[in-house]
Amino acid sequence: MNDTVREPAGGLGVNHGPALSVVLAGGGTAGHVEPAMAVADALSVLEPNVRITALGTSRGLETRLVPARGYHLELITPVPLPRKPSGDLARLPPRVWRSVRETRAVLDLVDADVVIGFGGYVALPAYLAARGIPGLRRRIPVVIHEANARAGLANRVGLRTADRVLSAVPDSGLRGAEVVGVPVRAAITALDRMALRAEARAHFGFADDARVLLVFGGSQGAVSLNKAVSAAAAELAASGVSVLHAHGPKNVLELLAPRTPDQDDPPYVAVPYLDRMDLAYAAADLVICRSGAMTVAEVSAVGLPAIYVPLPIGNGEQRLNALPVVNAGGGMVVADADLTPALVAREVTGLLTDPPRLAAMTAAAAQVGHRDAAAQVAQAALDIARLAPSRRRAVGGRR
């Protein structure tokens, strides 16, 4: 896939002197791309001259998200990794090594000083390519970040030769990992919900003193959340609860009696997508959401109490992601099969009409949330890159 490779900022084959070159391997899903972009932003703050290259594939969200954030993207052949042993494992080696060769070309092209991997099918070839070949290719230092409570295949492989391993939670399955949380973009970590609350509620049409429930299921929404919450609309209105519901661009929300901000009843504001999550978080008192690693990280970072509804697929990672917050008292977990309109009405009304309990959950969520994870990952990578033997030899000349 070398025909997809574009010239990196700074030019090909130029002596960049002390400017560090960092490659971020975190393509595929938003759960891999967003932490990578948060770290990219932190790198740019800590080291303004840093050269950042994101590694991805043509199939992932990175083709849209990375350029939108102003970073350079290089593409390799995707190698989807099976969650469990299967016939796909037999075909994995030749497919992986093709991607490894392409990744080596990218690492050479940008003269990489360090690779930061976030797991997934882009990270595995990056880890393998960075190992080097004695006498033929220099080794490139690797920093791993694991966002999920249960480490995936790529990061388990990368662990064997990684220079530094960081994780979102304890007991991720990566030996020796330092717990730093999930890297979250600065627009969220710097959010002061109370300071922005009046503006946020006016933006969505809620009263200043409203009790607001936020509902979202990720970028594509979640059908089970949509059905359960929309069916509880009448009961929520009777309890004085306003709702901000992002149902997903591909979904249609069916409300028996839609309520808008210009009506007397508490409004039920339904939108396909929220492009200002900072305002959504600031407007809300409580959230119902999935518990992907990125979602839990953002919700806890801003100190929002949550009813987490783990996606009922995979190996149970989403439930594990939510447990640290839940165990601290900042939220609760409800199984997808148990999320009924009656449960929504009962739990939401109970929480939003009990200010002391809600305040305690808010404080607990904020206590668990990590606001400096992106800076910690970025600093770890910069420190290791500067200490690398190949980097020390390169100062003043080409490697």
Swiss-Prot record:
InterPro entries with a match to the protein in the record: GlcNAc_MurG, Glyco_trans_28_C, GlycoTrans_28_N
Example GO biological process: peptidoglycan biosynthetic process
Gene3D superfamilies, per database record: Glycogen Phosphorylase B
Catalyzed reactions: di-trans,octa-cis-undecaprenyl diphospho-N-acetyl-alpha-D-muramoyl-L-alanyl-D-glutamyl-meso-2,6-diaminopimeloyl-D-alanyl-D-alanine + UDP-N-acetyl-alpha-D-glucosamine = di-trans,octa-cis-undecaprenyl diphospho-[N-acetyl-alpha-D-glucosaminyl-(1->4)]-N-acetyl-alpha-D-muramoyl-L-alanyl-D-glutamyl-meso-2,6-diaminopimeloyl-D-alanyl-D-alanine + UDP + H(+)
Primary residence: membrane
Enzyme class, broadest EC rank: transferase
One cellular-component annotation, GO: plasma membrane
Record bears the keyword Phosphoprotein: no
Subcellular compartments: Cell membrane
Xref: CDD domains: GT28_MurG (cd03785)
EC number(s) on file: 2.4.1.227
Record's function text: Cell wall formation. Catalyzes the transfer of a GlcNAc subunit on undecaprenyl-pyrophosphoryl-MurNAc-pentapeptide (lipid intermediate I) to form undecaprenyl-pyrophosphoryl-MurNAc-(pentapeptide)GlcNAc (lipid intermediate II).
Family: Belongs to the glycosyltransferase 28 family. MurG subfamily.
Protein name from the UniProt record: UDP-N-acetylglucosamine--N-acetylmuramyl-(pentapeptide) pyrophosphoryl-undecaprenol N-acetylglucosamine transferase
